[in-house]
Amino acid sequence: MTTITRISKDKGEFYLLWLSSGEKLRVSEDILVRQRLLKGQELSDTLIEEIKKASSYDVGLQMAMNYLSYQLRSKKEIFTYLKEKEIVPEDRVKIVQRLEELRLLDDAIFSESYVRTAMRTSDKGPRNVAQQLKQKGISEEDIQHGLTFYTLDEQLNVATATAEKAMKRYRTKSFKDALQKMRLHLMQKGFTNEIIDLALESLAFEKDEEQEQQALDKEGERLWRANQRFDFSKKVQKVKQSLFQKGFDYDLIQQFISEKEVEHDE
């Protein structure tokens, strides 16, 4: 028979049973009282297994509730967390069911909260938000429920702010190239073409001729250096082609090339 050599307080409502075998059992106060566990008490192997089984559920439930105290979680996240904590599968199921009964776990509410937070703190469109919810194990029905709070007006607000910020990053590009990259950027963020069109229309970006000229000069010089190994004619051809592909106007490109031709003839 194994004897309880010591009982000490652990975190929360838990206690540690120190056994003569050298093993330690973590039990809840409820189990301690229910089983009338005392120092010096002898425990059969059968009783030890019963205590372990009951403790797995209690410990797992307490861990899950503590995990939920920081923020809302999806059912999948709770299952994953309990698995990492080595809670046995049958207890994971019971724990999740108990949390649902206590209304501490609800994927529909999680979806709604996640969408509201994403709208307020991120630059992600509804498609990306939906994908993230799917990765968290949220059902399609609950995803669609959450997305009802991401209204068209909210999508437009987020897309517009994202586009405005992106345009500042692309100011060294041609106006045409900047618009294309910004559109692609918004698509990658998960916005629909309809919202992207409305966002760009509301911002009413206009070409700054001076900025366009500066962007062309900078890119043109970079390309000119990059093609130094070619003869003049081939270099002109490659630079013109690259600048055109980057969205610069033909007249500006031709002006840049003309200046290079003058330098070459001197």
Swiss-Prot record:
Disulfide bonds: none annotated. GO terms for cellular component: cytoplasm. Keywords: Cytoplasm. PANTHER family: REGULATORY PROTEIN RECX FAMILY PROTEIN. HAMAP family: RecX. Belongs to the RecX family. This is Regulatory protein RecX. It comes from Enterococcus faecalis (strain ATCC 700802 / V583). The gene is recX.
